[in-house]
Amino acid sequence: FSSVPVHWHEEMEFIVVKKGRGLVTLDRESRLLEAGQAVIVLPGQLHGIRQYQQERMEYENIIFRLEMLLPKEGDVCGPKFLEPYRDGKLLYPAWIDGSALYHEEMLECIRKMDELSEQRPRGYPLAVKGWLFQFFFLMFSRVEPTLAEEGREKSLDKMKRILRRIEVDYGKPLSIEEMAEFSGFSESHFMKFFKNHMGVPFVSYLNDYRLTLAARALAEGQEDVLTVAMDVG
């Protein structure tokens, strides 16, 4: 792969590197991750993956809704631990890179879930949930959380609106002038805002996004080159 453009979704995600190395972006921070390392992506968090130089990387995504661990009533796990974490009110380290002793224990939880999902023994969803609870127990019990910064959420929400507009209208001409007006910024402020959040200029991101979708469509072989080119603008 060359890249997975920065995007967001409502599900939680673990990105786990299996082989090689690659650059992973989480909100405004990018890190070089290698085999045996991972990152935790919260619902609504901006994230993406890029190739590092000419190196190859194999990774897997574990995507799930945290609500599967939240009972409707009569349980302290949700309101005391999981909900504040999901909503970004309490911040825990997202990078599982071996810098802490408990990282290996957390990666072992991911490996166990991976094995269960491949083998699928009877009742395996129960065990998967059990390992998810163990994963979060390790994190909550070993790390003191920090409070979210004021103003950070508004900035990220605006960036997510911009990305959603690109996802919907990438096949149309999208000018800096139009996107600046959509965002409520001047053109110069929009360009600065976008690059500060994404690490690349708007036009570069839009072109990369279109190329990524075109490559995916061609790989699936459902349409010819001309049709794909017209679809992605």
Indicate where each model-derived feature is located.
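A hydrophobic/aromatic-rich effector-binding and dimerization subdomain
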Residues: 1, 46-115
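Generic protein-terminus/edge-of-domain signal
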Residues: 1-38, 45, 53, 77-80, ...
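Residue-level marker of regulatory loop/turn positions in helix-turn-helix DNA-binding domains and
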Residues: 6, 151, 155, 168, ...
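Regular secondary-structure segments
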Residues: 18, 107-118, 163, 167-170, ...
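Nucleotide phosphate-binding site architecture
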Residues: 23, 69-70, 212
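An amphipathic alpha-helical interaction segment
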Residues: 87, 96-150, 157, 161
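Basic/polar phosphate-binding segments, predominantly the helix-turn-helix DNA-binding elements
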Residues: 137-145, 161-213, 219-233
